[in-house]
Amino acid sequence: IIVSANRTHRTVAEMAQTTWVIEGQEIEQQVQGGKEFKDVLAQLIPGIDVSSQGRTNYGMNMRGRAIVVLIDGVRLNSSRTDSRQLDAIDPFNIEHIEVISGATSLYGGGSTGGLINIVTKKGQQDRQVDLEVGSKSGFANSNDHDERVAAAVSGGTDHASGRLSVAYQRFGGWYDGNNDALILDNTQTGLQHSDRLDVMGTGTIEIDDNRQLQLVTQYYKSQGDDDYGLWLGKNMSAVTSGGKAYTTDGLNSDRIPGTERHLISLQYSDADFFGQNLVSQVYYRDESLTFYPFPTLTKGQVSSFSSSQQDTDQYGAKLTLNSQPLAGWDLTW
């Protein structure tokens, strides 16, 4: 198994750090059983903390330390630790996941615990159509159900291949054992009453036996329903006088929590570049992260509501050369 997250495309046996590769079939099996993507990672990756059941992956550390998340080598962590890196892709589009445990400086700061590189599915030479439909319910009431549908078409020739996919999931309400709706997280936001859309296209050109050109594009949007929110009681009693907060419809807000992202990456590799292995990549990522309005208390009374939104535009380039100048010696720069 070749690991690309270390930029040198080495095998697991050649890696000095503890490394795992989780195949897409394992992830799909867990997702089809009703688990959310972050819960699957917490179960399959040793040493990673259990997820918060919401949109955020805040607190999901590896062996107690922070992690970096990438999609096909493109870093998703931003300068603000907003913890939306795993709200990034539908499992339908995952080929496998590479996990490197321990501190690594290859992809910048924030990776003292390790890194998770999500490798997306690519097109095959043979024409193929994939379709997936699923539903989950706790049978509490008519809102207690999730639905998902995904489709992909891929194909190509000996020298070129591509894949186009669309995955959509609708999350309904979540309820406890008494059939009461669980309270929405109005800080990091949850997944109840939300929609997720993941559109992805990939293309690969085999220039010759050594050289390859690979393109990855993605549009991802995961957003709450603009009709559901957290009711804080009459006169905000839930935060001022110990009243009860609960989830209900009737929300009217211009700030709907969610994640929206565009990503494009172009990678060129040459296994015999003047006797060296060359891997280069240029990429662009823009995203908008929106949070719920949140009350501020002054002398026991709500004085204001505030909401935050982070807009990010990131572009970059990487170039790695790997060679063996002497037997048993590897040189990477």
Predicted feature residues:
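Outer-membrane beta-barrel translocator domains and adjoining extracellular loop/strand segments
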Residues: S142-H145, Y175-L182, Y220, D226-K234, ...
